[in-house]
Amino acid sequence: MSEDAKTLIDIAARAVLDEVPALKPLTLVVGIDLHGRGDTQQFRLQMPELDVRKDIAADARIRLEMRREFFNAMVEHDARVADWREAFIHGHAKATGVEQYMRLIVNVVERQEERNRTRKARH
């Protein structure tokens, strides 16, 4: 894949926010560490404006870590929220940070998934 990491992070963030619109107004700084070939690339994602920069993100409330190849493959295959959840459960990706933000995001995502399930059941 020829796209740079900043573009891929933007694509992934927009996909998650499109799938879980309740997260769109959240004001949050996320640090993203992509590990690969002996180095780590660090990025800063500022929400809600989705500003992605190559930066240490010292003010991040949440930090995401994963292998660069894994992240590229997830974005390339249009990963959905359920795919990301599996990645976190199986240890391919790791999230750390302020517990209140982590719990809030998990609750919002779970509610959205429940809404999607009930919507499908009605049809």
Regions found by a protein language model. Give the residues of each.
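Feature captures hydrophobic
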Residues: 1-123
